[in-house]
Amino acid sequence: MSTPAIQWYPGHIAKAEQQLSRHLDKVDLVIEVRDARIPLATGHPHLDRWLKGKQHLMVINRRDMVTPAAREAWEAWFKGRGQRTVWCDAKAGTGVKQVQQAAIRAGDHLNERRRNRGMRPRPVRALTLG
């Protein structure tokens, strides 16, 4: 006799994806946090499709857990794909200021676009996930 397949996992994921999609419609900037030890495995394969052209800042945390050579290789890999990244170690506070500055720059860019279209600047709505 075979064991029955677990059915709660796909439904759980589908529900979370629907909720995320609703939240993404309301934000200007998505700050995605990934693990430096496995940066590809800690990203969602459908995130680019969900972003629909929104500004995206990738924060790679736990930079202290990888060698400088590995960090440089990953940085080059992401840069080659047009993805801006900020490396940090949230536990030690290293790189957190750079994350803040990158988010502020993204907000400035958003408000510049709003001004060019005759709209007033407003606070940036950001979503952090990962």
What is the meaning of each model-derived region?
Residues 34, 60-61:
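Active-site flanking residues adjacent to catalytic metal/cofactor-binding acidic residues
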